[in-house]
């Protein structure tokens, strides 16, 4: 399962330990995956896969951060690891495997997404969007935060993020979208359906 900034893992079985294997990739620069209450730091080098194992013993939300200076947005490169019971985790996996739901009311927003630069970087399962540089947005609105943890995931913050990402996360590589208000409303409405 590919995620961005929010990782869901199952609770390890205390009788028969079941650690979780995590494959780590970086597309842009050196990073270091660090969630202090779960594991030590693991470095990421662009275009080289690295991996780690974690063996969580308690459910909850564990906070982490990139531990390698990686540019102007480094201080806002936050992450969350959700340790869930096996049943909760299995339900989350099932939901993540579903294609994005789109209805006619938001089809204009989907067209905007697929005809602007969004499609070059982002993936939305079940659509023609299969970019690999930015986060997979298939279930964007199931996340608590956007912009690597820089802002709560609300339609208002999403709108601000689309209009000018650098106001939310200085140094962001995402370009500002030059959309009129109607296009911005439609794109935000479309993204809000990706749950």
Language-model region placement:
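Non-transmembrane, membrane-proximal soluble domains of secreted or membrane proteins
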Residues: 1-117, 126-132, 149-156, 160-163, ...
């Amino acid at each position: 399962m590919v995620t961005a900034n929010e990782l869901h893992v199952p609770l390890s079985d205390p009788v028969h330990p079941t650690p979780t294997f995590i494959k780590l990739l970086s597309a842009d620069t050196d990073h270091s995956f660090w969630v202090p209450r779960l594991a030590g730091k693991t470095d990421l080098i662009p275009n080289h896969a690295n991996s780690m194992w974690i063996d969580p013993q308690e459910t909850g939300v564990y906070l982490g951060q990139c531990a390698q200076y990686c540019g102007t947005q480094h201080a806002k490169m936050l992450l969350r690891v959700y340790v869930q019971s096996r049943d909760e985790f299995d339900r989350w996996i099932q939901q993540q495997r579903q294609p994005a739901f789109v209805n006619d009311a938001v089809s204009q927003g989907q067209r905007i997404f697929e005809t602007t630069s969004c499609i070059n970087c982002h993936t939305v399962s079940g659509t023609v969007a299969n970019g690999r540089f930015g986060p997979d947005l298939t279930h964007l609105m199931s996340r608590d935060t956007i912009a690597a943890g820089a802002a709560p995931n609300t339609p208002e913050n999403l709108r601000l993020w689309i209009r000018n990402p650098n106001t939310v996360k200085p140094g962001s590589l995402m370009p500002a979208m030059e959309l009129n208000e109607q296009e911005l409303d439609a794109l935000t409405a479309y993204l809000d359906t990706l749950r």
